[in-house]
Protein backbone atom coordinates (compact mmCIF):
# COMPACT_ATOMS: atom_id res chain seq x y z
CA UNK A 1 0.00 0.00 0.00
CA UNK A 2 2.77 2.40 0.99
CA UNK A 3 4.75 1.39 -2.09
CA UNK A 4 1.82 2.09 -4.39
CA UNK A 5 1.16 5.41 -2.69
CA UNK A 6 4.82 6.41 -3.00
CA UNK A 7 4.87 5.45 -6.67
CA UNK A 8 1.73 7.48 -7.27
CA UNK A 9 3.20 10.53 -5.58
CA UNK A 10 6.41 10.19 -7.61
CA UNK A 11 4.43 9.96 -10.83
CA UNK A 12 2.42 13.05 -9.94
CA UNK A 13 5.56 15.02 -9.11
CA UNK A 14 7.16 14.06 -12.43
CA UNK A 15 3.99 14.95 -14.32
CA UNK A 16 3.69 18.36 -12.67
CA UNK A 17 7.39 19.03 -13.24
CA UNK A 18 7.07 18.13 -16.92
CA UNK A 19 4.05 20.37 -17.37
CA UNK A 20 5.83 23.27 -15.66
CA UNK A 21 9.04 22.90 -17.66
CA UNK A 22 7.25 22.33 -20.97
CA UNK A 23 4.97 25.28 -20.38
CA UNK A 24 7.89 27.49 -19.42
CA UNK A 25 9.92 26.81 -22.55
CA UNK A 26 7.14 26.36 -25.09
CA UNK A 27 5.57 29.59 -23.92
CA UNK A 28 8.81 31.53 -23.84
CA UNK A 29 8.14 33.29 -27.10
CA UNK A 30 4.58 34.09 -26.12
CA UNK A 31 5.70 35.58 -22.80
CA UNK A 32 8.18 37.95 -24.43
CA UNK A 33 7.03 41.56 -24.26
CA UNK A 34 5.46 42.84 -27.45
CA UNK A 35 7.53 45.22 -29.55
CA UNK A 36 6.50 48.81 -28.95
CA UNK A 37 5.35 50.56 -32.12
CA UNK A 38 5.23 54.33 -32.43
CA UNK A 39 2.98 55.27 -35.35
CA UNK A 40 -0.70 55.54 -34.45
CA UNK A 41 -2.26 57.63 -37.28
CA UNK A 42 -1.88 60.85 -35.21
CA UNK A 43 0.67 63.59 -35.81
CA UNK A 44 3.81 63.10 -33.72
CA UNK A 45 7.11 64.97 -33.47
CA UNK A 46 10.56 63.41 -33.84
CA UNK A 47 13.99 64.97 -33.37
CA UNK A 48 16.82 64.80 -35.90
CA UNK A 49 19.67 62.68 -34.54
CA UNK A 50 22.11 62.56 -37.44
CA UNK A 51 22.45 63.63 -41.06
CA UNK A 52 24.63 61.64 -43.47
CA UNK A 53 25.34 63.51 -46.71
CA UNK A 54 25.44 61.25 -49.79
CA UNK A 55 25.59 63.81 -52.63
CA UNK A 56 25.43 67.59 -52.96
CA UNK A 57 21.64 67.49 -52.58
CA UNK A 58 20.85 64.10 -51.01
CA UNK A 59 21.22 62.86 -47.45
CA UNK A 60 20.03 60.20 -45.03
CA UNK A 61 18.26 61.72 -42.03
CA UNK A 62 17.98 59.72 -38.82
CA UNK A 63 15.18 60.70 -36.44
CA UNK A 64 14.85 59.48 -32.87
CA UNK A 65 11.73 57.85 -31.47
CA UNK A 66 10.33 58.89 -28.07
CA UNK A 67 11.26 55.51 -26.57
CA UNK A 68 14.66 53.95 -27.16
CA UNK A 69 13.25 50.41 -27.19
CA UNK A 70 10.44 51.18 -29.65
CA UNK A 71 10.24 50.80 -33.43
CA UNK A 72 8.47 53.01 -35.94
CA UNK A 73 5.79 50.42 -36.67
CA UNK A 74 5.61 50.85 -40.44
CA UNK A 75 4.57 47.91 -42.65
CA UNK A 76 7.17 47.17 -45.33
CA UNK A 77 6.34 49.14 -48.48
CA UNK A 78 4.24 51.82 -46.80
CA UNK A 79 5.16 55.45 -46.15
CA UNK A 80 4.77 58.33 -43.74
CA UNK A 81 3.60 61.92 -44.20
CA UNK A 82 5.72 64.87 -43.09
CA UNK A 83 4.10 68.22 -42.38
CA UNK A 84 5.71 71.64 -42.38
CA UNK A 85 4.63 75.27 -42.55
CA UNK A 86 6.23 76.94 -45.58
CA UNK A 87 5.55 80.65 -46.18
CA UNK A 88 2.55 80.48 -43.90
CA UNK A 89 1.02 77.43 -45.58
CA UNK A 90 0.97 73.86 -44.34
CA UNK A 91 2.71 71.52 -46.77
CA UNK A 92 2.70 67.72 -46.83
CA UNK A 93 5.04 65.24 -48.43
CA UNK A 94 5.22 61.45 -48.26
CA UNK A 95 8.43 59.48 -47.78
CA UNK A 96 9.25 55.79 -47.43
CA UNK A 97 11.87 55.16 -44.73
CA UNK A 98 14.88 53.15 -45.82
CA UNK A 99 15.15 51.61 -42.35
CA UNK A 100 13.29 48.49 -41.24
CA UNK A 101 11.60 47.90 -37.91
CA UNK A 102 13.62 44.69 -37.61
CA UNK A 103 16.93 46.53 -37.36
CA UNK A 104 16.08 50.11 -36.37
CA UNK A 105 15.17 50.27 -32.69
CA UNK A 106 14.72 53.76 -31.32
CA UNK A 107 14.98 55.55 -34.67
CA UNK A 108 14.02 55.61 -38.35
CA UNK A 109 15.84 56.88 -41.45
CA UNK A 110 14.74 58.81 -44.52
CA UNK A 111 16.57 59.21 -47.82
CA UNK A 112 15.75 62.68 -49.13
CA UNK A 113 16.83 64.63 -52.19
CA UNK A 114 16.44 68.36 -51.61
CA UNK A 115 15.43 70.75 -54.35
CA UNK A 116 16.08 74.50 -54.44
CA UNK A 117 12.38 75.16 -55.04
CA UNK A 118 11.21 72.24 -52.94
CA UNK A 119 9.07 72.63 -49.86
CA UNK A 120 9.43 69.78 -47.37
CA UNK A 121 12.71 68.55 -48.90
CA UNK A 122 14.25 72.01 -48.51
CA UNK A 123 12.92 72.23 -44.96
CA UNK A 124 14.59 68.92 -44.13
CA UNK A 125 17.89 70.05 -45.65
CA UNK A 126 17.89 73.09 -43.36
CA UNK A 127 17.28 71.11 -40.16
CA UNK A 128 19.86 71.28 -37.39
CA UNK A 129 20.56 68.36 -35.07
CA UNK A 130 17.82 68.35 -32.45
CA UNK A 131 15.23 70.06 -34.64
CA UNK A 132 11.86 68.32 -34.78
CA UNK A 133 9.52 67.32 -37.60
CA UNK A 134 5.84 66.35 -37.59
CA UNK A 135 5.09 62.85 -38.87
CA UNK A 136 1.94 60.79 -39.35
CA UNK A 137 1.39 57.27 -40.65
CA UNK A 138 1.34 54.53 -41.74
CA UNK A 139 0.01 55.38 -45.20
CA UNK A 140 -0.16 53.53 -48.50
CA UNK A 141 -1.79 50.57 -50.19
CA UNK A 142 1.23 48.28 -50.44
CA UNK A 143 2.35 45.90 -47.72
CA UNK A 144 5.10 43.45 -48.60
CA UNK A 145 4.87 39.94 -47.19
CA UNK A 146 7.48 37.18 -47.65
CA UNK A 147 7.06 34.99 -50.73
CA UNK A 148 3.92 36.79 -51.89
CA UNK A 149 5.38 36.48 -55.42
CA UNK A 150 8.07 34.26 -56.89
CA UNK A 151 9.56 37.20 -58.78
CA UNK A 152 9.39 40.95 -58.37
CA UNK A 153 10.57 43.34 -61.05
CA UNK A 154 11.41 46.87 -59.98
CA UNK A 155 11.92 50.10 -61.89
CA UNK A 156 13.23 53.02 -59.84
CA UNK A 157 14.51 56.48 -60.62
CA UNK A 158 16.47 58.73 -58.25
CA UNK A 159 15.08 58.69 -54.72
CA UNK A 160 12.37 56.34 -55.98
CA UNK A 161 14.83 53.71 -54.81
CA UNK A 162 13.60 54.16 -51.21
CA UNK A 163 10.62 51.74 -51.20
CA UNK A 164 12.53 49.30 -53.41
CA UNK A 165 15.53 49.34 -51.08
CA UNK A 166 13.31 48.71 -48.08
CA UNK A 167 11.65 45.72 -49.76
CA UNK A 168 14.96 44.33 -51.05
CA UNK A 169 16.48 44.56 -47.57
CA UNK A 170 13.48 42.80 -46.05
CA UNK A 171 13.81 39.94 -48.55
CA UNK A 172 17.58 39.76 -48.16
CA UNK A 173 17.46 39.59 -44.37
CA UNK A 174 14.86 36.81 -44.31
CA UNK A 175 16.45 33.44 -45.20
CA UNK A 176 12.97 31.94 -45.66
CA UNK A 177 12.01 34.49 -48.31
CA UNK A 178 12.98 33.07 -51.70
CA UNK A 179 11.54 35.90 -53.80
CA UNK A 180 13.77 36.75 -56.76
CA UNK A 181 14.25 40.46 -57.42
CA UNK A 182 15.32 42.21 -60.61
CA UNK A 183 15.87 45.97 -60.30
CA UNK A 184 16.38 48.50 -63.09
CA UNK A 185 17.63 51.69 -61.46
CA UNK A 186 17.97 54.90 -63.47
CA UNK A 187 19.80 58.13 -62.63
CA UNK A 188 21.17 61.15 -64.44
CA UNK A 189 24.85 60.64 -63.62
CA UNK A 190 27.06 58.10 -61.87
CA UNK A 191 27.33 60.35 -58.81
CA UNK A 192 23.54 60.41 -58.50
CA UNK A 193 23.26 56.66 -57.83
CA UNK A 194 22.04 56.28 -54.26
CA UNK A 195 22.77 53.38 -51.90
CA UNK A 196 24.89 51.64 -54.54
CA UNK A 197 27.39 50.05 -52.10
CA UNK A 198 24.53 48.60 -50.05
CA UNK A 199 22.70 47.32 -53.13
CA UNK A 200 25.85 45.83 -54.64
CA UNK A 201 26.69 44.07 -51.37
CA UNK A 202 23.33 42.29 -51.37
CA UNK A 203 23.74 41.25 -55.00
CA UNK A 204 27.25 39.95 -54.29
CA UNK A 205 25.99 37.93 -51.32
CA UNK A 206 23.02 36.39 -53.16
CA UNK A 207 23.64 36.75 -56.91
CA UNK A 208 21.04 34.14 -57.85
CA UNK A 209 18.30 35.99 -55.98
CA UNK A 210 19.10 39.66 -56.67
CA UNK A 211 20.04 41.31 -59.95
CA UNK A 212 20.44 45.02 -60.69
CA UNK A 213 20.85 46.97 -63.92
CA UNK A 214 22.05 50.54 -63.46
CA UNK A 215 21.16 53.08 -66.14
CA UNK A 216 22.41 56.64 -66.64
CA UNK A 217 21.30 59.54 -68.78
CA UNK A 218 24.92 60.52 -69.44
CA UNK A 219 28.52 59.85 -68.46
CA UNK A 220 31.42 62.28 -68.32
CA UNK A 221 33.98 62.13 -71.09
CA UNK A 222 36.45 59.35 -70.34
CA UNK A 223 34.39 58.02 -67.44
CA UNK A 224 34.16 54.24 -67.21
CA UNK A 225 30.64 52.85 -67.07
CA UNK A 226 29.54 49.22 -67.20
CA UNK A 227 25.80 49.84 -67.07
CA UNK A 228 23.42 51.09 -69.74
CA UNK A 229 22.85 54.58 -71.11
CA UNK A 230 19.59 56.22 -72.09
CA UNK A 231 15.96 55.67 -71.22
CA UNK A 232 14.27 52.51 -70.01
CA UNK A 233 12.94 50.87 -73.17
CA UNK A 234 10.80 47.87 -74.02
CA UNK A 235 13.94 45.90 -74.88
CA UNK A 236 15.47 46.73 -71.49
CA UNK A 237 12.35 45.68 -69.60
CA UNK A 238 11.95 42.49 -71.62
CA UNK A 239 15.57 41.46 -71.03
CA UNK A 240 16.04 42.42 -67.40
CA UNK A 241 12.63 42.08 -65.72
CA UNK A 242 10.42 39.03 -65.13
CA UNK A 243 7.83 38.15 -67.75
CA UNK A 244 4.19 38.80 -66.84
CA UNK A 245 2.60 35.97 -64.88
CA UNK A 246 0.41 35.38 -61.84
CA UNK A 247 3.57 34.77 -59.79
CA UNK A 248 5.30 38.01 -60.79
CA UNK A 249 4.75 41.65 -59.87
CA UNK A 250 6.17 44.88 -61.27
CA UNK A 251 6.87 47.79 -58.90
CA UNK A 252 7.47 51.36 -60.09
CA UNK A 253 8.72 54.45 -58.28
CA UNK A 254 10.40 57.55 -59.65
CA UNK A 255 9.81 60.68 -61.72
CA UNK A 256 6.27 60.77 -63.22
CA UNK A 257 7.45 60.66 -66.87
CA UNK A 258 9.51 57.54 -66.17
CA UNK A 259 6.66 55.83 -64.33
CA UNK A 260 4.15 56.69 -67.08
CA UNK A 261 6.48 55.33 -69.75
CA UNK A 262 7.08 52.13 -67.79
CA UNK A 263 3.33 51.61 -67.39
CA UNK A 264 2.78 51.88 -71.16
CA UNK A 265 5.64 49.52 -71.95
CA UNK A 266 4.42 47.04 -69.34
CA UNK A 267 1.09 46.74 -71.16
CA UNK A 268 2.85 46.08 -74.47
CA UNK A 269 4.80 43.29 -72.74
CA UNK A 270 1.61 41.62 -71.54
CA UNK A 271 1.22 43.02 -68.03
CA UNK A 272 -2.18 44.17 -66.83
CA UNK A 273 -2.83 47.87 -67.28
CA UNK A 274 -1.84 49.82 -64.18
CA UNK A 275 -4.73 51.35 -62.27
CA UNK A 276 -4.90 55.08 -61.44
CA UNK A 277 -4.50 54.18 -57.76
CA UNK A 278 -2.45 51.05 -57.20
CA UNK A 279 -3.49 48.36 -54.73
CA UNK A 280 -1.39 45.66 -53.09
CA UNK A 281 -2.49 42.80 -55.36
CA UNK A 282 -2.10 44.69 -58.66
CA UNK A 283 0.26 43.10 -61.16
CA UNK A 284 1.76 46.56 -61.77
CA UNK A 285 2.04 48.74 -58.66
CA UNK A 286 3.21 52.37 -58.73
CA UNK A 287 4.21 53.94 -55.42
Swiss-Prot record:
Keywords: FAD, Flavoprotein, Membrane, Mitochondrion, Mitochondrion outer membrane, NAD, Oxidoreductase, Transferase, Transmembrane, Transmembrane helix. Its main location: mitochondrion. It holds the Pfam family NAD_binding_1. PROSITE patterns: FAD_FR. It is found in: Mitochondrion outer membrane. GO terms for molecular function: 2-(3-amino-3-carboxypropyl)histidine synthase activity; cytochrome-b5 reductase activity, acting on NAD(P)H; NADH dehydrogenase activity. One of its GO terms (cellular component) is mitochondrial outer membrane. Pathway: Protein modification; peptidyl-diphthamide biosynthesis. Residues 41-145 form the FAD-binding FR-type domain. It catalyses: 2 Fe(III)-[cytochrome b5] + NADH = 2 Fe(II)-[cytochrome b5] + NAD(+) + H(+); 2 Fe(3+)-[Dph3] + NADH = 2 Fe(2+)-[Dph3] + NAD(+) + H(+). GO terms for biological process: protein histidyl modification to diphthamide; tRNA wobble base 5-methoxycarbonylmethyl-2-thiouridinylation. Disulfide bonds: none annotated. The keyword NAD applies. The chain crosses the membrane at residues 5-25. It is a single-pass membrane protein. It is an enzyme of class 1 (oxidoreductase). InterPro entries: CBR-like (IPR001834), Cbr1-like_FAD-bd_dom (IPR008333), FAD-bd_FR_type (IPR017927), Flavoprot_Pyr_Nucl_cyt_Rdtase (IPR001709), FNR_nucleotide-bd (IPR039261), OxRdtase_FAD/NAD-bd (IPR001433), Riboflavin_synthase-like_b-brl (IPR017938). Its EC number is 1.6.2.2. FAD binds at residues 125-142, 151-183. Monomer. Component of the 2-(3-amino-3-carboxypropyl)histidine synthase complex composed of DPH1, DPH2, DPH3 and a NADH-dependent reductase, predominantly CBR1. Belongs to the flavoprotein pyridine nucleotide cytochrome reductase family. NADH-dependent reductase for DPH3 and cytochrome b5. Required for the first step of diphthamide biosynthesis, a post-translational modification of histidine which occurs in elongation factor 2. DPH1 and DPH2 transfer a 3-amino-3-carboxypropyl (ACP) group from S-adenosyl-L-methionine (SAM) to a histidine residue, the reaction is assisted by a reduction system comprising DPH3 and a NADH-dependent reductase, predominantly CBR1. By reducing DPH3, also involved in the formation of the tRNA wobble base modification mcm5s 2U (5-methoxycarbonylmethyl-2-thiouridine), mediated by the elongator complex. This is NADH-cytochrome b5 reductase 1. It comes from Eremothecium gossypii (strain ATCC 10895 / CBS 109.51 / FGSC 9923 / NRRL Y-1056).
Amino acid sequence: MDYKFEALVTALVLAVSFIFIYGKFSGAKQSQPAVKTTLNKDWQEFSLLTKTVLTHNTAIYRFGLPEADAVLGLPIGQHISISGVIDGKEMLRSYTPTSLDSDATGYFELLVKSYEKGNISKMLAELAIGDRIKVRGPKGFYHYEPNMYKEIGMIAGGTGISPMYQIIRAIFSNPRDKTRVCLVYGNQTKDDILLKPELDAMVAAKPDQFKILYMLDKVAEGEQWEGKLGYITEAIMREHLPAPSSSAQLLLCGPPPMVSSAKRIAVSLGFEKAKPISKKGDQVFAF
